[in-house]
Amino acid sequence: MSLKDRFDRFIDYFTEDEDSSLPYEKRDEPVFTSVNSSQEPALPMNQPSQSAGAKENNITRLHARQQELANQSQRATDKVIIDVRYPRKYEDATEIVDLLAGNESILIDFQYMTEVQARRCLDYLDGACHVLAGNLKKVASTMYLLTPVNVIVNVEDIRLPDEDQQGEFGFDMKRNRVR
């Protein structure tokens, strides 16, 4: 069977005849098929709609997982453990996000990072917090509390007298200056 015949049959398979009254020509040529276990199955033509459905399914599964974790921790009467992390470089943020995905609370102290690295790390953690429906609260000048969806954090706004006199950055793009 020639390549042209294969191509024509492939085209004929996907074309629709608008006039069905025309007689169909039947060829009496033998059909050769080869069976190879290494051939890949044909991909469906409506792949973009399936990928949109898959994304929607992933979001639904993520939301269901978050609700499941929230229900599990509400039922648990065990003590709550808060991990304290001192990231020293931006790459440490992925470990912190993994802890959040595991439904753990994390207290993050950025005192060992430069201001630029801390802002970048905080932006990454904030994005992950929104994706995982967590909470990110500033509890001190260089400390943030990252909690899963089922933990509620109430932080009072307490201004210590020495805090305004320090010239440190609060990582919220504003500099605390003495005036």
From Swiss-Prot:
GO terms for cellular component: cytoplasm. Coiled coil: none annotated. Pfam families: SepF (PF04472). GO terms for biological process: division septum assembly; FtsZ-dependent cytokinesis. The keyword Cell cycle applies. Disulfide bonds: none annotated. Residues 19-55 are annotated as: Disordered. Keywords: Cell cycle, Cell division, Cytoplasm, Septation. Gene3D superfamilies: SepF-like protein (3.30.110.150). Residues 33-55 have a biased composition (Polar residues). It is found in: Cytoplasm. InterPro entries: Cell_div_SepF, Cell_div_SepF/SepF-rel, SepF-like_sf. The keyword RNA-binding does not apply. PANTHER family: CELL DIVISION PROTEIN SEPF. Cell division protein that is part of the divisome complex and is recruited early to the Z-ring. Probably stimulates Z-ring formation, perhaps through the cross-linking of FtsZ protofilaments. Its function overlaps with FtsA. Homodimer. Interacts with FtsZ. Belongs to the SepF family. This is Cell division protein SepF. It comes from Streptococcus pneumoniae (strain JJA). The gene is sepF.
